[in-house]
Amino acid sequence: MSFSVEVLAGIAIELQRGIGHQDRFQRLITTLRQVLACDASALLRYESRQFIPLAIDGLAQDVLGRRFTLEGHPRLEAIARAGDVVRFPADSDLPDPYDGLIPGQESLKVHACVGLPLFAGQNLIGALTLDAMTPEQFEVFRDEELRLVAALAAGALSNALLIEQLESQNMLPGSSGVFEPIKETHMIGLSPAMTQLKKEIEIVAGSDLNVLIGGETGTGKELVAKAIHQGSPRAVNPLVYLNCAALPESVAESELFGHVKGAFTGAISNRSGKFEMADNGTLFLDEIGELSLALQAKLLRVLQYGDIQRVGDDRSLRVDVRVLAATNRDLREEVLAGRFRADLFHRLSVFPLFVPPLRERGDDVVLLAGYFCEQCRLRLGLSRVVLSPGARRHLLNYGWPGNVRELEHAIHRAVVLARATRAGDEVVLEEQHFALSEDVLPAPSAESFLALPACRNLRESTENFQREMIRQALAQNNHNWAASARALETDVANLHRLAKRLGLKD
């Protein structure tokens, strides 16, 4: 069997029929798998020494969420280094990145693999991978024929990346005009809700508007801020982060605006605040709903006039800063309750964005699970970490009250449990490795404390009880530290310090 002119023409026609890049990529991959009669095919984008799946056929859905680093996948590294078709023998010692990821063949290893590097000029931009369980599957196809397929795929991918670059305004007036793929922002998801959010980010990123990012705790609001910054003309300048919930009232003004030597006890030198650090760049204010009304008034002045005053200084400093703010509160309700200034709310919410909760993102759960599985594989030095079909169904059926952050922790915990019960460096996550419950945990009681393992002394007993109290408060408040601090009737900064001392956070 070989490629006829009709077959190549058919592939080219399928590329033109697609509506949007994603549809074209999927048509290409599906057609190739049919023509080559192989078990799996994938189109990957190359960026920063890793391959990012764009379209797959015949592979588990979570592959779309994985990020394949060259260091962790020797076959993909060989493809990246090659300038031509790469054929891996059936007895190759190099592990295949898709072992265990072909549905119905999870227990078997891939026997035939072909890699086609894709170039735009001299720049590697991606790869096509073709896999089969039959060792001789690709021997009937000549390298010349596979090169033609690679050329068609490279053209489609190059055009898509160039259009994406232009749409996101990375090709700015005065730039070199050289093709540079946009940096990965780790915003993984193909659900309608995430697709809409990405479109809105593209719209607002190129402007200089302030943006208010809303959403539940753990949904990934910081990633949205990073994506906005990376897609803006300010991307070459700093993105400065400040968690307003972790700021004690006594130092909040200094953190935002800086101070001069002698402004207060302990001010032994001049210090720049976050606004100065973010000059000509972007300042991301997380948990902005936790700021006091007094600080809200000072923040409003900066947004109105573009100048700041360091604590203890009468002089004003001009700053050029774009502000991105995030909150898990309903700020409209906070305004009505008198806890948030209406004028500041309107200044910040010129272009509001909402990050959807994970329960509204459908199959994105599986893609994100694949991403975290690959992270765990690299971190623990495992050859593979895969989800069983039962585990995938289990993850899809759960409501994820803690959103993406809860999913990340669940995957990491499941990998550790599965690794402990299985010899070797291959881990398959089963349903029983996930202890998921949407029930609200009860507050710790004296009985639960007495049921803890016996401790050696009073200090250890006290620390164990504090640890349990903090865990329960975080669980009841969706891992929101500010809300947990209020529930425990303590200052959020003190709670962070105590949790760090007790080993509950890095």
UniProtKB/Swiss-Prot annotation:
Signal peptide: none annotated. CDD domains: AAA. Pfam families: GAF (PF01590), Sigma54_activat (PF00158). ATP binds at residues 215-222, 278-287. Keywords: ATP-binding, DNA-binding, Nucleotide-binding, Phosphoprotein, Transcription, Transcription regulation. Residues 187-416 form the Sigma-54 factor interaction domain. GO terms for biological process: phosphorelay signal transduction system. The modification 4-aspartylphosphate is found at residue 57. Pathway: Nitrogen metabolism; nitric oxide reduction. GO terms for molecular function: ATP binding; ATP hydrolysis activity; DNA binding; DNA-binding transcription factor activity. It comes from the Bacteria. Required for the expression of anaerobic nitric oxide (NO) reductase, acts as a transcriptional activator for at least the norVW operon. Activation also requires sigma-54. This is Anaerobic nitric oxide reductase transcription regulator NorR.
